[in-house]
Regions:
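Positively charged n-region of N-terminal signal peptides that target proteins for export
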Residues: 1-3
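C-terminal motif of bacterial Sec signal peptides marking the signal peptidase cleavage site
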Residues: 12-13
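Residue-level hotspots at or immediately adjacent to binding/recognition sites across diverse folds
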Residues: 16-354
Length: 354
């Protein structure tokens, strides 16, 4: 969603709902600020391992570390600086292979791919609809991915690739629920869409009367929508979705235009996103911009926003604050190491230890 992000700052697997995970009280999270080499606003992070991490953001900024954050390399995308592209999402598979999504109106929404560590890039997709604005994307594997745009003329805009990004055809309108007036996503962190296994994906929406989660269980061929009990309208809705398995997920957001606001902006599901219930609001005020499940730690997730960084050990039912600095996105490369990024080139390493 281009309008409200401040620059300064299908069948689902069925079964009985599991009890909330038992928190590991001995484990703790610590933050390690990194030495930065940019002052750009960083809005996305992808860590395919504990040692390899890619981050991206405004002013065509892309950085990569191959040594767990000890050093960072700038990565040049030819022509991106001329258009001052905002790389608001990144997905990396290793130190060599990564995809970038630039967000913006019309042709400023693009998808790029590198297979040689950023030495060269292929522009795979350029948006040709002046009213579309691509917010986020995610991949099931190196060949199959999904990208989401704000709705256009009353229809949802979901694209699927099955050939490594060479083509991105639109999902037919008949396979998608109708869009609400104004419905889209908040392109804050690259976490408004999440994929799981080889078939499941979820997309969080906002800026319409009601916040919703779109879900697919067949690799993006068909989609359904569920209302989420998070305030909607204008600058409100969902900015992030996070799932630890095909049943248990968390949807987070709020009012992205009011950093002092407090509202019911966290919801949980135990049936794959068919139904949602309100959960405990995170500790920091304002909206959650990004969230991620910590892999290998059931029920653990980290949520970030312009007013702080929280973590939960019980799927969002309770929260612990770790920082009050501004962050826009968060990602984990293992059960022990993650990364949060934000304004003025901020990169912070998150370490889970006993």
């Amino acid at each position: 969603m281009k309008r409200w992000l401040p620059l300064a700052m299908g069948m689902v697997a069925c079964g009985p709902a599991a009890a909330p995970p038992v928190p590991d009280s001995a484990a703790r999270l610590t933050l390690e600020p990194q030495t930065t080499i940019t002052t750009a606003l960083l809005q996305a992070v992808s860590a395919p391992s504990a040692r390899v991490v890619w981050v991206s953001g405004h002013a065509a900024t892309v950085l990569r570390s191959r040594d767990g954050g000890q050093t960072w390399e700038p990565v040049n995308v030819p022509g991106a600086a001329v258009d001052s592209l905002q790389f608001r999402d990144v997905q990396a598979f290793d130190a060599r292979t990564a995809y970038l999504l630039s967000a913006g109106p019309g042709p400023l929404s693009r998808i790029y791919k590198t297979a040689d560590g950023g030495r060269s890039w292929e522009r795979q997709f350029t948006n040709t609809d002046s009213t579309a604005f691509y917010d986020c994307f995610a991949f099931w594997d190196m060949r199959r991915g999904v990208a989401f745009s704000d709705a256009v003329r009353g229809r949802m805009m979901v694209r699927i690739t099955e050939d490594g990004g060479s083509t991105w055809p639109l999902v037919p309108a008949a396979a998608l629920p109708p869009a609400q007036p104004g419905e889209g996503a908040f392109a804050a962190s690259g976490t408004c869409v999440v994929t799981l296994d080889q078939r499941h994906a979820w997309i969080g929406t906002g800026a319409a009367d009601t916040a919703r989660v779109l879900r697919t269980a067949d690799g993006g061929r068909t989609w359904s929508a569920s209302v989420v009990p998070v305030p909607g309208g204008g600058t409100k809705g969902l900015a992030a979705v996070a799932f630890r398995d095909t049943l248990h997920g968390t949807a987070l957001g709020g009012d992205v235009a009011d950093p002092k606001s407090r509202m019911d902006n966290v919801a949980i599901t135990e049936d794959g996103g068919r139904t949602w219930q309100r959960a405990t609001t995170q500790t920091f005020s304002g909206a959650v911009y990004g969230a991620v499940v910590i892999p290998g730690r059931p029920g653990w997730l980290v949520a970030v926003g312009p007013r702080g960084l929280d973590y939960s050990k019980d799927d969002g039912r309770s929260w612990t604050n770790l920082d009050t600095l501004a962050y826009w996105s968060v990602g984990f490369g293992s059960k022990d190491v993650g990364w949060a990024v934000g304004p003025r080139g901020r990169i912070t390493r998150i370490v889970v230890s006993r």
